[in-house]
């Protein structure tokens, strides 16, 4: 049950990026936005595949997830791609400075999970900055609505870093 709640929270918190083209056009209707719609569908597909691979855990999928996230990053306006790229780096015990940079870029776009994880990652090295990110989280619309709390967001982010297998 806990695993399903985590997965549902992951998909719900995945981010709602706004797009400048009409993405509601059906495939059989001619539209001037068809290239934009195709690009948006590919972006959504890349993000979904990458999130599923990351949430499944294991290092087998990391390389493909990384490639999908890099391709999706060019269209991402929500900070979601940077957040998941940082998760992969943290999970691999890779370059922490690069992971922090990716999280900061995602935080600038108000990605809630990135802000929570950034506050946690900076807690030991820069407590003042970590506290500022925690305060920034409290100012997000999603936090003001009561769901998810900072602790719940950390639980989801930590679950991505060390997935339950």
State what each model feature region is.
Residues 24-49:
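Post-signal peptide N-terminal segment of mature Sec-exported envelope proteins
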Residues 13-15:
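C-terminal motif of bacterial Sec signal peptides marking the signal peptidase cleavage site
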Residues 127-165:
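Terminal, low-structured helical/coil segments at or just beyond the last alpha-helical repeat
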Residues 28, 59-67, 92-102, 126-132:
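Structural signature of tandem alpha-helical TPR/SEL1-like repeats
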Residues 17-19:
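Bacterial signal peptide processing site
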Residues 71-72, 104-106, 136-137:
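Canonical positions in the second alpha-helix
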Residues 39-46, 53-57, 61, 74-82, ...:
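Short helix-capping/linker turns of helical repeat alpha-solenoids
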